[in-house]
């Protein structure tokens, strides 16, 4: 693994500087972009100065489609419906890892991790409420 790290650092000019390993939370100020429970949405970012490559990762997490399924989801998977317990930083793993041994192709890219908290399969939402009282995605 030391050979991989040495090779990776020799190939990229930005590798000689100290790279930030933590992705920092950025909460969105646009009040119309929220999680299911009304908390603000956001993203984590790690900039790699000198790199022109970007990796944007949208977290998955399934969906809910009615008041009943959303209430059940909130009880069992609250982290996928709220930003209230998001930590201020995250360490990337796998393809988001800043370690060349773990991620030899993208370790020094600028990375963005977008947590999933809207239960809409990344399709957006509507301000209208359906006949059953459910506000959600236009599917």
Swiss-Prot record:
Signal sequence extent: none
GO molecular function: palmitoleyl hydrolase activity
InterPro entries associated with the record: PAE/NOTUM
Superkingdom of origin organism: Eukaryota
One GO term of the biological process aspect: negative regulation of Wnt signaling pathway
Role according to the record: Probable inactive palmitoleoyl-protein carboxylesterase.
Family the entry assigns: Belongs to the pectinacetylesterase family. Notum subfamily.
Protein name, per record: Inactive palmitoleoyl-protein carboxylesterase notum1b
Organism: Danio rerio (Zebrafish)
Lineage, broadest ranks: Eukaryota, Metazoa, Chordata, Craniata, Vertebrata
């Amino acid at each position: 693994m030391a050979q991989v790290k040495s090779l990776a650092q020799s190939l990229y000019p930005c590798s000689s500087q100290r790279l930030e390993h933590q992705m920092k939370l950025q909460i969105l100020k646009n009040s119309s972009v929220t999680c299911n429970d009304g908390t603000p949405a956001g993203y984590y970012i790690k900039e790699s100065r000198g790199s022109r490559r970007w990796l944007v990762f949208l977290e998955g997490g399934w969906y809910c489609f009615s008041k009943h399924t959303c209430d059940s989801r909130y009880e069992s998977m609250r982290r996928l419906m709220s930003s209230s317990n998001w930590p201020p930083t995250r360490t990337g793993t796998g393809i988001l890892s800043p370690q060349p041994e773990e991620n030899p192709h993208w370790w020094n890219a600028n990375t963005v991790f977008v947590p999933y908290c809207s239960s809409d399969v990344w399709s957006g939402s509507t301000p209208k409420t359906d006949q059953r009282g459910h506000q959600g995605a236009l599917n």
